Amino acid sequence: ISSARNLAELDELRQINAQIMDPRGLSEKKINRLIKKGRVVVCQSMSLHASEISATQMAAELAYDLVTDTAEETKKILDNTIFLMVPCFNPDGQIMVTDWYNEYVGTEYEGTSMPWLYHRYCGHDNNRDAFMLNLVESQYMARIMFREWNPQVFQDHHEMGTYGPRLFLVPYSEPIHPHGDPLIWRELNWYGAHMAYKLEEAGIQGVITGAIFGGWAHLGFHWIGNYHNITSMLTETAHARLATPIYVHPHQLVGDGSATLRAMPHYKPQTNFPNPWPGGWWGVRNMIEQQLVASKALLHHAAQYRETVLKNAVQKALRQTQRGAEEQSAGFLIRPDQHDPLTVATLINKLLLQGIDIQRTRHRVALGGVTYPAGTYFVSLNQPKRGVIKSLLERTFFPDDAW
């Protein structure tokens, strides 16, 4: 979704975007020309978990508003961004959940969970597949995010528990993973603050930031994207009983029950949660309204600061490349002649699906007392995707400290 002019120049803008996200070898003058011409690419996906129904219902309304609204703010979004929307990440599961819900509306089972998985091969864990990319839906998303478009910004819309805040926005809570560029974590604060402000402006209560969901977690798309230099985030909307509203009494609203660094020990006002929702009826329309505001606010912020976002994208790519060039370890050598060559080929393919550059040696290489044959794979850290390479191929240890 974009302006008619941008859509007419889509192939050129995609090529410009590819150079912005990987500016190696470009002069400063060339980079500045690309930034002047480029558009911010924003991707948002909905209802990866099929039982989290509201985002897919919101998607059609979001698209309609963007293509019909004549307000200046919407025009700025269309002129300055290219919006890639995945309205339903798991359409088969969405149909299953819808059919189950409709079958039992008006019975004692209305709004209950299905007694089988809404994804045949992985259930709820499709949100853990952004690094292995075993599922066809994950492969499709990886093609968009890591090879064909490489957006500057990604947001994934989810649902969470019923008896707490109404909406979570980034930044994530502590701790953070070590391999993202520091600008990523600043940008998450930047986007999250703007979305939270716009929600408060719209009179929507119960929005929390910097809590509950940590910055070191499984490698779903909204986490692994950060190590690709894509500012990647999620929203989490309070759940209802699928499409059936529920009534939440004030005494049912609670924090996480402990003074942890998840940053919500109690359900009462605090700096990242200044306007608690008091309770009452809660249903899909409430969920859609806040997701619409958050989605549009993200797009508007990217459009408003188009050049800054693109400059940051260049800076993140160059910084990560430079860090890789200066590290003690230049990269990873992977022998092709191991006892299980098919698994080697699978590993290399997984890395290629991430858009990682991989080279092969022309001759034998002797290193550290080991001789590697010609044709050995070399995954250099001297590239913009250094963060994701280190996240996938190095050992990392969750901090054994206050976090």
Spell out what each predicted region is.
Residues 52, 95, 161-163, 241:
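Hydrophobic positions within alpha-helical membrane elements
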Residues 1-53, 60-82, 128-129, 134-136, ...:
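Intrinsic-disorder/low-complexity accessory segments
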Residues 107-125, 267-271:
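Aromatic- and acidic-residue-enriched carbohydrate-binding clefts of CAZyme catalytic domains
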Residues 78-97, 382:
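Short, conserved secondary-structure transition motifs
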Residues 86-90, 101, 156-164:
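Short, solvent-exposed turn/loop segments enriched in Gly/Ser/Thr/Pro and often Arg
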Residues 145-160:
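Proline-aspartate-enriched helix->loop->beta-strand connector
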Residues 97-109:
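Aromatic- and acidic-residue-enriched segments that line the glycan-binding/catalytic groove
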